[in-house]
C-alpha cells in the first residue's frame, strides 16, 4: 500500500512535509559548521529541508535532534546469535548516529600488525573504508517509510549491516555493482554529498569491493523485498 501511494503521488519520504514542526538541529549545525557549509533558513530551503510553504520536510526530521529512527548494534560471542557480548542503540540526528555507530564498530575492529622488512604495517580485521561505506549506504539509502532500525550485527568472523528496504524499483544488484545510482532519499543523499561524507552517487558498493581487492574473503550482498544486507 505504501509503495502504491508513493508511486501515485510521487512524493518520497524525505520530501514529504514533517508532522513534527518543533525541530532542533544542534548536532547537525555543528557538523555543517565544521565542514564550512552554511545552515541558515535559505540554505535549508535550497537543500529541501524546508518546503515552499516554510514547513520542515521529513529530510529535516532525519537530520534533527528529534529523529525517530535509530541504529542498533549487537556484538556476539561467536559466529551465532546465541549469546550477546554487548548491545547499543544510537539515537538523534542521523549524522550523530553515523558518527557514534562508526566509532563503536571500530572498537570491535581489531588492529593487527605485520612487518615488511623493518617497517610495521597495521591491518584491521575489516578495512575501515569498507565499514564506513557500508554504514553510510545503510543510512542514506534505507527506506524511512518503515520505523524499524538499521541493524549492525558484529560476530567473531563477520559484520552484517542490515538496512530496511530492498533496492529501488527497477534496479538490480547487477546494476548497483556496475555503479548505476537511483537514490531512494535524494535530499539526504545530497546533504551527505555536500558534507563530503559520500563522494558521488553509485560508488559505495564499488568502493567496498575495491577495499577488499587484495583479500581472499569478499563482501556479500543479499537483497530481500524489504532488506539489504552487506556482510
Describe these PLM feature segments.
Residues 1-147, 154-157, 165-183, 204, ...:
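Active-site helix-to-loop segments that bind/position phosphate- or nucleotide-bearing substrates
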Residues 153-155, 223-224:
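A structural signal for short secondary-structure junctions
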Residues 161:
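Pre-DFG segment of protein kinase catalytic domains
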Residues 216-222:
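Glycine-rich ATP-binding loops of the HATPase_c
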Residues 226-231:
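Conserved alpha/beta core segments of nucleic-acid transaction machinery
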Amino acid at each position: 500500500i505504501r509503495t502504491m501511494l508513493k508511486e501515485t503521488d510521487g512524493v518520497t519520504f524525505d520530501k514529504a512535509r514533517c508532522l513534527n514542526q518543533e525541530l532542533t538541529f544542534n548536532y547537525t549545525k555543528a557538523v555543517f559548521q565544521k565542514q564550512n557549509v552554511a545552515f541558515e533558513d535559505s540554505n535549508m530551503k535550497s537543500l529541501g529541508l524546508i518546503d515552499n510553504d516554510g514547513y520542515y520536510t521529513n529530510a529535516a526530521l532525519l537530520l534533527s535532534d528529534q529523529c525517530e529512527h535509530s541504529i542498533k548494534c549487537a556484538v556476539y560471542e561467536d559466529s551465532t546469535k546465541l549469546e550477546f557480548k554487548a548491545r547499543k542503540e544510537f539515537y538523534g540526528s542521523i549524522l550523530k548516529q553515523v558518527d557514534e555507530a562508526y566509532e563503536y564498530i571500530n572498537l570491535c575492529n581489531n588492529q593487527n600488525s605485520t612487518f615488511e622488512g623493518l617497517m610495521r604495517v597495521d591491518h584491521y580485521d575489516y578495512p575501515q573504508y569498507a565499514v564506513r561505506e557500508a554504514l553510510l549506504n545503510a543510512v542514506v539509502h534505507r527506506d524511512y517509510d518503515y520505523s524499524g532500525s538499521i541493524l549492525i550485527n558484529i560476530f567473531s568472523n563477520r559484520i552484517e549491516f542490515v538496512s530496511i528496504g530492498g533496492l529501488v524499483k527497477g534496479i538490480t544488484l547487477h546494476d548497483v555493482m556496475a555503479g548505476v545510482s537511483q537514490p531512494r532519499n535524494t535530499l539526504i543523499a545530497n546533504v551527505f554529498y555536500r558534507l563530503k561524507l559520500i563522494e558521488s552517487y553509485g560508488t559505495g558498493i564499488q568502493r567496498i569491493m575495491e577495499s577488499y581487492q587484495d583479500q581472499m574473503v569478499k563482501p556479500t550482498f543479499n537483497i530481500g523485498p524489504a532488506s539489504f544486507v552487506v556482510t
